[in-house]
Amino acid sequence: MISLPRFKHPWDQILLVLILLTIIIVNFSPATWLIGWDNLMPEFNIWMNLKRSFFAVWQEYQGLGLVGGMGHATDLIRQLILLPFTLILPNSLIRYLWHFAMLFLGTFGIYFGLKKLFCRTDQACLIPTIASLFYLLNFGTIQYFWVPLESFSTFWGFFPWLIFSLWDYLNCVWNRHACSLQLKKLIFLNILAIPSFYVQTIFLVYLACIFLIIFAFLIRTGQACLPSTIKIVILIFLINSFWLLPFGYFLKTNLTNPVAGIGNFMSSDESFDRNLRRGYISDFLLLRGYYFDFPDTHATFMAPWGIHFSNNFNLAAGYLLSLFVLIGIVYSIYKIKKPIHLSLLLILSLVSLALLSATPPFSFINQFIRQNPLLNQVFRAPFTKFIVPAIFVFSIFTAYGLQTLVTLATRLKYSQKIFTLILVSGYLFLISIFSFPVFRGQLFYSLNKQSVPKQYFQMFDYFRQQSPTARIANLPQGSFWGWTSYRFGIVGSGFIWYDIEQPILDRAFDAWNLKNEQYYWELTTALQSRDPLLLSRILSKYSIEFVLFDDNIFFPSEKIYSKTALSTKDFLSQVPGLSLEKQFDKISIYRFHQPTKPYLISSPPILNAQTFFYTDFAFIDHPDYLTSPSAKINYPFLNLFTNRLQSEIPLDIKINNQQIQIGSTNFPLNDSLNQTKNHSPLISNTQQLVQTNDDPPLQFIRLTNIDSSNLIAWNFPDAAFENSYLLRVIYRHHQGLPLTISATSENLNYKFFYTRLDQKPGWQTAWFIIPRFENYNYGTGINVIFNNTSLSYRTSQNDIQSVDLYPLDYYPLASTQLPQYSKTLQNRQYLDEKSSIFFHKIKISSPPLPNSYLVLPQTFSPDWLAFYF
């Protein structure tokens, strides 16, 4: 092996430290929090969050309570590491501290790992330094830290240490003493790296890399290392068992929830299409992923980097850097008989399969794998899962590429020192040009560096004085996406639950429990219809004790929800049983007269179970009902709900002989609204009117897009908001993404629904309920809007044959009960309790009435057990 020049002092390490310190200094903003997007912030209340992580299987604070669907327990390790720092440092520094520490850890992980391969003494050499700089400054790393998530940055920081320590362990199986030391080191590193697996799919990626490395060593060294490989696999599972077992319980009992959630249903195909746009070799060589194109409110998500790469010289620097990677790949192919090189090439194949999703033959394999709905859901955004192994192997290949060029120059009789000086200087110049925005403060998204107003800490202090089980409804509410924008700058999935112990009914938790999502559908119906009594019933049904209205929240891209927020604030004072309790600047806290406490009910009515609905008419008629397949009371039309998937509609809907047939019930057909409908003008290059030669001829509008989107809308100007309607759409999906469809009022007061049409072949008919949101005739005009979108270079093509709107008296239909029973009254007997996450001790002072039931507000999950003694 040809060694590059060495120095008497560790100037290379000093150089790395200086570069890292420079990056930290220019990217740290004093008096701000690193907050927003997706974030884990236990430092707000470290002791409370430690308890949550320790008892992670049940997430009581998430809405109605749910079985943890993320690797919540994994963050326990990180929280224990952070604990002493939270006691001595301002909490606003903690996230900066962790992510900057991971930058140091990952950079020096590459450095020390490669130093063993390329340097025979403890003196410095240049190859590890150059490769470490690549690991730090490549564009994959920049994207990974742009909106830093603790799981991602931890994986980035520990991955080099994990892989190099595994290589060391497998290389020393013939030396028992050395092997024992390496095993202890490997166990220690695997324990520290556990926070990486908060996003569990990263654990799957890590396991895949481990198995590929083990396979490479077994192929090249034979059976000698088999016992050691079995031992390390068992140890990895044992080390991670404390969070894998709770997650296994989630998979057993709640797997369908994240797959069926409306947010995941709407975003899975779209997320993969975004990844597909960057699934080409030209992007792979730059490690450029879908973050680069991600939209923001006013510009692209990574606008500073987009401007930087608009200069072809900067882009060329990146491709020149990739030449070293390609040379290293060729070198590893030449050395493929060595297990390390074989394992590198196997990991390269894995990340190529994931990231080259638009490049044959990897695209064909991708399409085959994604026929499985679960795998398609889990790996809908492969970039964030596979980019770290890609960065790692690219860094190692860079080192081998440098070594190969130096070796070649030496054999060609060039001066090694002069050639090395030119080569290293050129590389440093290229990587400096390529990554220059990092040194101008562009490591983190600028909107993620914000101050948190004092009013939030006042609110946190207030809730510390309240019952920890008191459920909170947070308002205003917008769409189902669970993405919140604050007027003072924070944008993301939310943060207040990191310092509020009470359960919060936020949209961020809907994906893990469909009961949370059902609450949202009822809530948005009540808010848009401005019905105080209906909202009061929702608060009662879901045992909500507090309503938190935060006027700092706004909806920059949804004017309809902005209007709803204004009206919500006005009518909260009219909600029966709800009174203003506390005001902290723009944050208003209301208390409902019914507490979040266990209670007894006697002889409750038993109804048939429902799935999704707009309004729970069963609860209006029979508060605190039970559900059973053998129920005597049935609401056959209650779950005639169309805001989600067409396949979930429980009743067949048809039009026959001038009648609307829903199930076996007929309703008169009124076609008058369709006489005055109109649609927006066609855009010539993407929207085409097609007429077939059939008899009779078939006419439809074809929408075609490549890496673009366009809208087409049907307007029904005479549709009054005081009525409910049934919408029929006849459409056909050809290829790419299916159509999204939404219905709004022309005056932008109401958004009736927003969903995605099916991808079934052939002509399909979709039905949608548009419920009445007004009891008075103040406005008319309904728009039905279709969006044909392609987020990649793949064609999206869909046809629309007809869009028709018919009046339908929906509310009397949905409230129909069979047989007809008189309404019942609510008869709750509230009880005192002592609670501790898994355990609720409830004292019943007097013998309960016959046929009494104990209701625990957490019983929206079926997994609780009650014992009476």
Language-model segments: residues:
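Membrane-interface coil-to-helix junctions
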Residues: I19-T107, L133-W156, M266-F309, T359-L375, ...
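Membrane-embedded helix bundles of polyisoprenyl
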Residues: I23, L103-L117, A124-C172, S180-L218, ...
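Extracytoplasmic
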Residues: F265, G426-A508, I844
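Hydrophobic, aromatic-rich transmembrane alpha-helices
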Residues: I214, L238, T297-W305, A317-L353, ...
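Membrane-helix boundary/interfacial segments in multi-pass membrane proteins
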Residues: F44-N45, G140-F155, A260-S267, M302-A316, ...
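Extracytoplasmic/lumenal acceptor-recognition loop(s) of multi-pass membrane glycoenzymes
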Residues: R52, A358-F362, S467-Y542, I553-F555, ...
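Periplasmic/ER-lumenal interhelical loops and adjacent helix-loop junctions
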Residues: N49-G65, G71, F242-G328, F383, ...
